[in-house]
UniProtKB/Swiss-Prot annotation:
Its EC number is 4.2.3.4. Pathway: Metabolic intermediate biosynthesis; chorismate biosynthesis; chorismate from D-erythrose 4-phosphate and phosphoenolpyruvate: step 2/7. Zn(2+) binds at E184, H247, H264. It comes from Listeria monocytogenes serotype 4b (strain CLIP80459). Its main location: cytoplasm. The keyword Aminoacyl-tRNA synthetase does not apply. It holds the Pfam family DHQ_synthase. Belongs to the sugar phosphate cyclases superfamily. Dehydroquinate synthase family. This is 3-dehydroquinate synthase.
Length: 365
């Protein structure tokens, strides 16, 4: 089975990925889990309904397993749900020898990791992602919940014991969720590898390809790209910020939509178009943005922007971005495909780019 090793400064751990990863690691994993005093599984309503039986079968021989089922979507990454999970942990009597399993998409991985990082100052946890999007969020140790004023504003860096990535779960993902996760695969290609981007564009040309083509080698490459960056910079003091390409504008848009109007990958797609447009202005980026947007449309993405989204709200949200320092908004731009840079953008440039993007496609968000 393909295995990728993540070598962060604080911990080294494996990422297991294939179509039957849960079954393939079952014996070794359950032996490890049996050493803990209690196994606590955090999942959401949708994953519990579809896939709980699969995880139950793997954990069947363990003496003590408790589930917490969170609401679906970004609603789970709130103070209210975080407090409720903590209450459940305390009432259940989990001690420091317990372990948490985050079983779900990126939201559950973020929430579960943050719960594990903060319960009794930290207990071990495993990531068992079930979505394409989670190939990015499950690796690297970023864990967080949202604040009404910004996405992932309350969080930590806390690495899992392992990531068990069973791609059989993708079969039940709606097309919109597949597309959202695929956006992060596009991001990894843009910041690292023109050849990878071309391979994605040649392989995936319509929505059904998400289900009929093999995503695994592309997911592996994306995880390898992220693992290499995390090995250099675990806590985002430097190059790890490159992984935020498209996220400064994207997170601002998510916040404007109250973390529900757009899925994460949908917002990041708009953010990547915005960042590519600014990269053309600042660095003369040699990139066929029109071809790129046409490809995105073929895959079902909406690439047009709605002029009714108020710039002042987006700018305010961008100021709350974690890369913003001394009130200067930091953008991840591209000098060329595979060559990201951090650029301090002034308000005038942010507005001019906003207007340019609107001119190139409006009334679509």
């Amino acid at each position: 089975m393909p295995e990728i090793t993540v070598r962060a400064k604080s911990k080294t751990y494996p990422v297991y990925i294939n179509e039957f990863a849960l079954e393939d690691v079952r014996e070794k994993w359950t032996e490890s889990l049996a050493k803990f005093s209690h196994v606590f599984v955090l999942t959401d309503e949708h994953v519990a309904e579809l896939h709980k039986a699969k995880l139950d079968a793997v954990l069947a021989d363990l003496p003590v397993v408790t589930y917490y089922v969170a609401p679906n979507g970004e609603e789970a990454k709130t103070f209210r749900v975080y407090e409720d999970v903590m209450t459940k942990l305390i009432e259940t009597g989990l001690d420091r020898k317990a372990v948490l399993i985050a079983f779900g998409g990126g939201v559950i991985g973020d929430l579960g990791g943050f719960v594990a990082a903060t319960y009794m100052r930290g207990i071990p946890f495993y990531q068992v992602p079930t979505t394409v999007l989670a190939h990015d969020s499950a690796v690297g140790g970023k864990v967080a919940i949202n604040h009404p004023l910004g996405k992932n504003m309350i969080g930590n860096f806390y690495q899992p014991e392992a990531v068990i990535y069973d791609t059989q779960f993708f079969a039940t993902l709606p097309e919109r969720e597949m597309r959202s996760g695929f956006a992060e695969m596009i991001k990894h290609a843009l910041i690292s590898d023109q050849t990878l981007l071309r391979a994605l564009m040649d392989t995936f040309t319509e929505p059904k390809d998400f289900y009929t083509k093999d995503l695994t080698p592309f997911l592996q490459r994306g995880i390898e790209i992220k693992a290499n960056i995390v090995a250099q910079d675990e806590t985002e003091q430097g190059v790890r910020a490159y992984l935020n390409f498209g996220h400064t504008f994207g997170h601002a848009l998510e916040a404007y939509g109250n973390f529900g109007k757009w899925l994460h990958g949908e917002a990041i797609t708009y953010g990547m178009i915005y960042a590519l447009t600014m990269s053309e202005t600042i660095y003369g980026l040699d990139f066929d943005l029109a071809e790129f947007k046409t490809w995105l449309k073929q895959l079902g993405y909406d690439t047009t922007f709605d002029a009714t989204v108020p710039f002042n709200k987006i700018l305010e949200n961008m100021r709350h971005d974690k890369k913003t320092t001394f009130n200067e908004i930091s953008m991840v731009l591209l000098e060329e495909i595979g060559k990201p840079v951090i650029f301090k953008a002034e308000d005038d440039l942010i507005f001019e780019t906003y207007k340019r993007v609107m001119r190139n496609g409006g009334n679509g968000i």
